[in-house]
A protein has these predicted regions:
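Amphipathic alpha-helical segments used for helix-helix packing
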Residues: 1-16
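Short amphipathic alpha-helical interaction patches enriched in hydrophobic/aromatic residues
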Residues: 11-14, 66-70
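Short amphipathic alpha-helical segments with heptad-repeat character
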Residues: 15-18, 22, 26
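C-terminal peripheral helix-coil segments that are non-catalytic and often amphipathic
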Residues: 26-42, 52, 57, 61, ...
């Protein structure tokens, strides 16, 4: 993931790059939030789901899982993130 690779390297060195990454991740989260909201409206996800909060939690979890996958060279963190995502969205 580009965000994972660049964020640790360039955010301390370049304010403009930090702001670009911040803007980009904000747009990704906004897009995913819209998808979750649409799923709630279609009855695919629980009605009581706070789409923005859930989306942020899931996004942050996947960023962490991506980092741990690189460090551990195993897919365990990604599998854990997938299971947690399904549970959080009520898909289990």
């Amino acid at each position: 993931c580009l965000v994972v690779k660049l964020s640790a390297e360039v955010t301390d060195l370049s304010e403009s790059m930090r702001l670009t990454l911040k803007n980009g991740t904000g747009r990704v989260i906004a897009c995913l939030t819209n998808c979750v909201q649409e799923g709630v409206h279609k009855g695919e996800f629980p009605v009581n789901l706070d789409a923005k909060t859930v989306t942020e939690e899931i996004y942050y979890m996947w960023i962490g899982a991506t980092l741990l996958t690189k460090v551990g060279r195993t897919h365990a963190a990604l599998e854990c993130a997938m299971n947690a995502t399904k549970e959080r969205l009520g898909l289990n």
